Amino acid sequence: MARRSVSIFNRLLANPPSPFTSLSRSITYMPRPGDGAPRTVTLIPGDGIGPLVTGAVEQVMEAMHAPVHFERYEVLGNMRKVPEEVIESVKRNKVCLKGGLATPVGGGVSSLNMQLRKELDIFASLVNCINVPGLVTRHENVDIVVIRENTEGEYSGLEHEVVPGVVESLKVITKFCSERIARYAFEYAYLNNRKKVTAVHKANIMKLADGLFLESCREVAKHYSGITYNEIIVDNCCMQLVAKPEQFDVMVTPNLYGNLIANTAAGIAGGTGVMPGGNVGAEHAIFEQGASAGNVGNDKMVEQKKANPVALLLSSAMMLRHLRFPTFADRLETAVKQVIKEGKYRTKDLGGDCTTQEVVDAVIAALE
């Protein structure tokens, strides 16, 4: 033991730490005993560009020696249901990383994304639409978090043909789910030092359904006096987003509105290819690209292997924080943003012509 101590001491003398090392760190992260144990994460590569971008994440995780092991399952959007073993895997592991799953337009195949959310009660979708240093956009100072109810609303999947040529689609809003998503939005704002929560609605027309959603948000807002609460009609919200997006902070929405607003805000802030996101419930979480806007089915992008991996890499940083691996998360996020800021390695959607692999190699080289 004494010899080993001398050896370590000699190595330190030969390679003294930089006097600036401590300046680059925050106050020490003190893990709890056992926090470094490797975690198993369910991996669903998905359709289209999914295998490309999830493969990018696997490479970067391996390069970082992150304590994460992936349990891979092949799930495709044209399946009639999510295989039971996949559901059991997510229930067991608590966390899933997912590429995009295509949902056929029309026909009798239901969305596997909705099946996963309902089966696992993953009720909140979160998309962080924020300007990324180095990407030139029309608007600056955009930092919007869109929190969307994930399990009901227009996406309940309750549709039927009443008589030939007449289809009825039901929008379901409940007090329980509305209060739950409102509580999550305010809790997120409180824990992340956000100053304002905006509820998005169409209660001027859908007076009962969206009226119940607003009533629930107002009830929850009473318990967070330090956070400003306001409301905006969804069509006005869309106009305000493209005119003055910096006015928004946290937005809480029913299902359909949140999907549209998140993709719009992502486009304003720099593009869907760089916006991270995740879905969370009381027991489970699924991390994926924050806003997809049709990238899943881009066959040309798949053939050329030029899918942008940035959004899923940043979503993976969110996942690492969720797993309580904050240092690995910081390293990954810093490396990705450094590559974007330098501007040398970018895919076509960001003004470059790089392949997915070239971006991945640049991120790995930038890891500290």
UniProtKB/Swiss-Prot annotation:
Tissue specificity comment: Mainly expressed at a low level in pollen.
Keyword Transit peptide annotated: yes
Cellular localisation: Mitochondrion
Entry keyword set: Magnesium, Manganese, Metal-binding, Mitochondrion, NAD, Oxidoreductase, Transit peptide, Tricarboxylic acid cycle
Transit peptide, residue positions per record: 1-26
Keyword Transit peptide: yes
GO terms, molecular function: isocitrate dehydrogenase (NAD+) activity; metal ion binding
Protein function: Performs an essential role in the oxidative function of the citric acid cycle.
Name the record gives this protein: Isocitrate dehydrogenase [NAD] regulatory subunit 3, mitochondrial
Organism placement in taxonomy: Eukaryota, Viridiplantae, Streptophyta, Embryophyta, Tracheophyta
Gene that this polypeptide is encoded by: IDH3
